[in-house]
Amino acid sequence: MNLKALPAIEGDHNLKNYEETYRHFDWAEAEKHFSWHETGKLNAAYEAIDRHAESFRKNKVALYYKDAKRDEKYTFKEMKEESNRAGNVLRRYGNVEKGDRVFIFMPRSPELYFIMLGAIKIGAIAGPLFEAFMEGAVKDRLENSEAKVVVTTPELLERIPVDKLPHLQHVFVVGGEAESGTNIINYDEAAKQESTRLDIEWMDKKDGFLLHYTSGSTGTPKGVLHVHEAMIQQYQTGKWVLDLKEEDIYWCTADPGWVTGTVYGIFAPWLNGATNVIVGGRFSPESWYGTIEQLGVNVWYSAPTAFRMLMGAGDEMAAKYDLTSLRHVLSVGEPLNPEVIRWGHKVFNKRIHDTWWMTETGSQLICNYPCMDIKPGSMGKPIPGVEAAIVDNQGNELPPYRMGNLAIKKGWPSMMHTIWNNPEKYESYFMPGGWYVSGDSAYMDEEGYFWFQGRVDDVIMTSGERVGPFEVESKLVEHPAIAEAGVIGKPDPVRGEIIKAFIALREGFEPSDKLKEEIRLFVKQGLAAHAAPREIEFKDKLPKTRSGKIMRRVLKAWELNLPAGDLSTMED
């Protein structure tokens, strides 16, 4: 990294002095900003919406929504009313009670946000699903969570295998002309009849409110449960890291199927009473730059992949738009390349602030802040109230510049509460000494900045999304031509990594480009488009351990011309 440190930004930031705040901050201070600190009545969705609707912010715009067909805005008062309506629909027609799982499987739209907030208001645990998921991925998540209700659209309805999900009692369909039946309910018709007044279910701090499924390198996706207490850290990171101010227009580009789109696309901004922008439809530079110009976006949270795609569109494209409203730009999902930081400085005249966290942590943990110098390529420093370290495999802290496990001291407010139906997996995240081990390798420099070095396991980060190789391999071997498959992440200048599959064919099948395309489509239709291999290489056989596990590190060594390391466990 030959880029010089970018100096702290002058200005009236919410986090004024990092070192001083880090020394003295206590999470109890953050609790004072919530109505439940006085009333004892606690619900994250109430705090995000109703608290403002019952204050001087009631007529403030909470949501700007736009896509190719819709251009709408909703005040906090209207958000309260529409989410109340959604809560009443789920209660009356879905028999939803406290603790029930309600999954939302639909593209971005205002209704998605009304329904998620309404579900949480009545005590349900909301589970967002990415719209690109195919039947197999949807079934796995609904089955594991024992979801009682799923909300979808007519286009996605056929991907929900209702007859294979005995716990699923009701399917609500939003938009279109879906006929209500035994367990299919037309949401739009039901919502018209419902009151905008709702009896809110008051919760305890440790009651669940969000269930996000995340991929690992082995096993099926795991359900990470977050509890209402997480709102404390979601609020505080919105204040410090996003640096949200009363007058800000804020845009997080992430889909709510991913944890960033929920935590930083819903809760952090609205807990802070900010105006939130949601853009539906596909990415295009014209749409994105046009949104910033049209709505006067001040704070923008996106991902390195998106920034690289904007880079690819050329500086001339950016120059066509007035982007001077931007005050603060942030990135998440994968390490931020120095060339993207350089480009951001040139095109926006702004620093891009990298942030690090993961589904399991529930909110940002290690970040770059406006009040602090940025070392390009560094993750930054831990937020006040969080202790981070580099530890060895026994949990001993390592000195500066020694690479090891990136670990966080247990007990921050947004830490996952459990892994759904898998307490043993939850316990496996922790080391002696109370350390949560992230699965990332990193080192810390002498000034306390952390530097990401890669995944300890094999999870693939493609376009900012985590893809578990095991899930892709499992789908691949369902194809009749495939005997065995191994999947790795291959470095890519635009997407960070792409998925590459090594495949051994069954007897009677011959390698061909036509077969590659058929296999790619098979995974796309069975899992999701982003999970389909972009490269496929046929092999006579794949390297395996004696117990039969594919040795992905050997595949990666083949691909990148690296030493394969210890091969003592490989079968002959």
Swiss-Prot record:
InterPro entries: AMP-bd_C, AMP-bd_C_sf, AMP-binding_CS, AMP-dep_synth/lig_dom, ANL_N_sf. Acetylated. Deacetylation by the SIR2-homolog deacetylase activates the enzyme. Its cofactor is Mg(2+). Keywords: Acetylation, ATP-binding, Cell membrane, Ligase, Magnesium, Membrane, Metal-binding, Nucleotide-binding. It catalyses: acetate + ATP + CoA = acetyl-CoA + AMP + diphosphate. ATP binds at G333, E334, P335, D354, T355, W356, W357, M358, T359, D440, R455, R466. Mg(2+) binds at V477, H479, I482. CoA binds at T260, S463, K524. Its EC number is 6.2.1.1. It is found in: Cell membrane; Membrane raft. The modification N6-acetyllysine is found at K549. It comes from the Bacteria. Its main location: membrane. Catalyzes the conversion of acetate into acetyl-CoA (AcCoA), an essential intermediate at the junction of anabolic and catabolic pathways. AcsA undergoes a two-step reaction. In the first half reaction, AcsA combines acetate with ATP to form acetyl-adenylate (AcAMP) intermediate. In the second half reaction, it can then transfer the acetyl group from AcAMP to the sulfhydryl group of CoA, forming the product AcCoA. Has a role in growth and sporulation on acetate. Belongs to the ATP-dependent AMP-binding enzyme family. Interacts with FloT. This is Acetyl-coenzyme A synthetase. It comes from Bacillus subtilis (strain 168). The lineage of its organism: Bacteria, Bacillati, Bacillota, Bacilli, Bacillales. The gene is acsA.
